[in-house]
Amino acid sequence: MIATHIKRHNAPKGLFSGNMNDAEISLQNEKIYQMIFLKRNLNKFIEKGDLNQSIIAQHFGTSQSQISQLLNSKIDSYTMETLTVFAFMVDSKLGLISSRDEAKQKMLNNKLALMKEISLKIKEKLKADKINQSELGRKYFNTNQSVVSEFVNEVNFKVHVSNYSYDRLRKYAYVCGITEKELDEYEK
């Protein structure tokens, strides 16, 4: 079983029924669940003697002190994106899998897929409410029209994907009302 993401993204049902404040709370909760998943599985392999913090740090491409913080539930300095990339490199039965490059590529693919989902919801909302991109950006994302236009123009997703952290995309998904089931579809 490949670890991807402990699914606790409980977006409100309905198109654009969420807000950025609740999205931030949801994201912080998701980080905790992701940390629990990583901590539980990494500690299991450490206790068996299969891994140590140094090996994990080397595999994850980070410092041993960062791994120590993770294993001690200190995740303030971690983003959801980093925790999820780490989770892509852990299998609950096999231990460490996937290289950091493979995990980062999987994250990039997930971010592009999530941008497409958000794009569909934005287009649907623009049409349904007959509002312009600036209004939608201000009202729902606390941002400007240029951000919304980047989601409307799918041709440039590969150009713009680097502008968006996974954390930010998860918050936008929450606001858009993208459900856990929809997120599961692209996170496979």
Question: What do the PLM-derived regions correspond to, one by one?
Answer:
Residues A57, A87, L126, G137-R138, ...:
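The alpha-helix within a helix-turn-helix
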Residues F60-D76, N142-Y164, Y186:
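Recognition helix of helix-turn-helix/homeodomain-like DNA-binding domains
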Residues D50, G61, D91, K130, ...:
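Central "turn" residue of the DNA-binding helix-turn-helix
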Residues D50-N52, Y78, I131-N132, D167:
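Residue-level signal for the short linker/turn that defines the boundary of a DNA-recognition helix
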Residues M80-G95, N163-E182:
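DNA major-groove recognition helix of helix-turn-helix/homeodomain DNA-binding modules
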Residues K44, Q58, Q69, L120, ...:
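DNA-binding alpha-helical recognition surfaces that contact promoter or target DNA
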Residues Q53, Q64-S65, Q69, L94, ...:
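The DNA-contacting recognition helix of HTH DNA-binding domains
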Residues M20-G49, I97, A103-E135, K139:
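A short, Lys/Arg-rich alpha-helix, primarily the initiator
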